[in-house]
Amino acid sequence: MNSKLTVIVLLALITIASCGLINEKKVQQYLDEKLPNGVVKGALKSLVHKAAKNQNLCAFNVDTVGMCDADCKRQGKAKGVCHGTKCKCDVELSYKK
């Protein structure tokens, strides 16, 4: 039960951090206070960092809801392409050519 609650709290913190309601630094400080040093703490901190860097809901090179492409078109660019969790305008993935 305790591990399930921990996962729910972590997912809630990631969601709040990625929405910009609180910043990543505060979530990282919370994890530093609550978790002992070790592999799990490092993995969770890495996961929070990756989730907080997310732009336009890009995940695993996929524009999940079309926000990347729409944002680039608003800027006058031809196409938006997800590179991991980042959105880049008019820059194709080099390994998919």
Swiss-Prot record:
Disulfide bonds join 58-82, 68-87, 72-89. GO terms for cellular component: extracellular region. Residues 1-19 form the signal peptide. It comes from the Eukaryota. Residues 55-95 form the BetaSPN-type CS-alpha/beta domain. Belongs to the long chain scorpion toxin family. Class 3 subfamily. Selectively inhibits Kv1.3/KCNA3 channel (IC(50)=0.95 uM). Both N-terminal and C-terminal domains are likely involved in the interaction with Kv1.3/KCNA3, since neither its N-terminal domain (1-36) nor its C-terminal domain (37-78) block Kv1.3/KCNA3 channel. This is Scorpine-like peptide Ev37. The lineage of its organism: Eukaryota, Metazoa, Ecdysozoa, Arthropoda, Chelicerata.
